[in-house]
Structures are given as C-alpha cells and as structure tokens.
Amino acid sequence: MVSNAVTRATKSELPIDPLRIVAKEMKHLTGNIRQLLGSGHPSLDRVAKYYTQAEGKHVRPLIVLLMSRATSLCPKAPDSPHTHSTATIDSAISPLDVLADVNPSSPDFSSQPESSEHDVLPSQRRLAEITELIHTASLLHDDVIDHSVSRRGSPSANHEFGNKMAVLAGDFLLGRASVALARLRNAEVVELLATVIANLVEGEFMQLKNTARDERNPKWSEDIFPYYLQKTYLKTASLISKSCRAAALLGRADATTVDNAYAYGKNLGLAFQLVDDMLDYTKSGKDLGKPAGADLQLGLATAPLLFAWKTTPELGILVGRKFEQEGDVQRARELVYQSDGIEQTRALAEDYSHQAIAALQTFPDSEAKDGLIEMAINTLKRQK
C-alpha cells in the first residue's frame, strides 16, 4: 500500500508542489501572524516580529493546512463540536475592556476574509498560524540556549537584541499563541497545543544530557537510542504530530482519521529530525544556512554518532565529556565518518517516512493527500 501511494505521488503528470495546493491559505500566513503579534511597546514589537521578516520554510503550517484539506474528505465524527467561523475565532471570550486594560494595543486578531474554499476552515487556518508562533518562540529560546549568532541567514535575535529581549519575545509569542488558541473554543485542541509547549521544555531538559544517567564515561547500552528518540519526539515531532491531530479534530473527522493524522505527524517529525541530524555531518555551514557541526560544538550526541558509538567504544569517552577537550569534535566526526552511522540514520529516517505515508492509506485520494505524501518524500531529500 505504501509503495502504491508513493508511486502514484511520484508518477503524476506534473510534479507535486505541496505549497501550491494550499497557496491561498499560505499567502496570508505571515501577515496574519504579524497582526497577532502587535504590541504597544516598540522594542517588543520589533523583537517579536523579527523572525517573521526573513521568509522561513513554514513547514509546520504547511503540513497543518494540507492535513486540514486532506481530512475534509474523511468520515466525520458523530456529534462533533461546532466548528467556529472567522468572526468567532477572532472574538474575545473575556470582556475587551479587561483584556486590553493598560494595554490599548492589544490586537483584535482579525484575519483575512474567509475564502470561498470550505475544505480548510477558519479555525484550521488559525491553527496553522498558532503552530508557527509556537515554533518561532522555540527558535527564540533555543538560540539563547545554544548561543547562536545566526538564523535564516541573518543575525539571530539574541545576537541582535540580547538574551533578555530574545527570551521575553519568545514568551510573548507563546502568550499570543495561547490567546489565539483559547479563541478556537475547542478544549481538546487547547490541551494538545498546551502539551506541546510543555514538551518543548521537557525535550530541552533531556537534551542537556546525552544519556539518561549522564555518566562521565558512559558505555553503549540499548536504552541510549530510546532516550534520544524520546527527546527528539518532545523537541520536534510533538508539535507536528499534535497539530496534525488538532487539524483533524477541528475538521470534525472521525476517531480513526484523527489517530492517523497524529501518526503521520509523529513519524514525519521523527524523520525530519533524523535528516536534520544527518545534515549536520554531511553539509557545509553555507549549505545549511547555519553553522555545520553545531551539534558536536554544543556537546550533543545525535543519531549518526549514537549509531557509530555502538561499534566504536572510543566515542563513549568523548560523549561523556561532551566533546569539550581540544580535538574532541574533529575526532568524533572522523569516527562517525569511518562508521556506517550516517547510513543507518538515513535508513531509520526512511523507515519513519514510510510509516508516515502508511498512516495516510485510509484517506480518500486527493491533491492534499498527495501533498502530504510528497512532504514525507521530500523530507528525505532535504539539503538544509
């Protein structure tokens, strides 16, 4: 079934462009996000909107919109909650004079006019924007933690404005995302995305250690890779999987469809991060748009090194001291290149990509489904 789906997606008459399928919805994404981020404090306004100036890949909202369109053709859940219109999701729940008290610049959250296309609902478009807000907030915080100096080819926010401003801007984005999320008026969707925010923090704490016990001279054990995959889910796949599930819920899809949407997002997210970890070893900083080898410089052992470690005990010493001594980073890279760690990482990413495609097999054939399949295929072809 998976091979048939891939064949159909890759042998269509015209190349599949996932972005084209939801181009109308994506067109207003950045503008709507900037409107959600309005602040009466000029400095905060500038920092909060800083990462919206450079055109990012917008992978997560693209996936949400494709999933919204693909699941619109799936069976509906009985007695599912009412899906709210643009007017409803833009209107406050609390009195406006309370929400805007001493904050006259609190945005009205107004969106672009509703499209005549009804297969992507206003609430699902807003979910795509919320997903990007949460992701951007995590970038602001991660860049502070990682002491990053660049992002998307420009100075990172922490480098441009300082750590304090970057952290506060990230917090502000999460606050705005939470308000927009509440106005979707769907308790399960709120629960899912609130859990994502907690997961991002949990994953970051797990990343402070390369192994569960964080020993100074660790030995390879079978629990090392599950620890890495759990951290990877929390930091990367949680947002993609839970936003896919939320998109299906907002579209009133039945339980099977909702579960399959989640499975697609989870497997795609894991594949995405595995490829990201692999590129850190195979591409230059110029190709990536960020420093190559950054993971090792930060003391992080990712999939290629973990696979190599299983047959190269010397890596355990380097992992234990987090590559801090002179020559450690270069030696670790050499040992990874001498192993099949990169090839095993690629194979695992392919497996997760195929599992993502398999999760879509019960979805009716559609352009959006083909777009989701193409996203899974393209994840393996990423060069940055």
Regions found by a protein language model. Give the residues of each.
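All-alpha prenyltransferase/terpene-synthase fold signal
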Residues: M1-K384
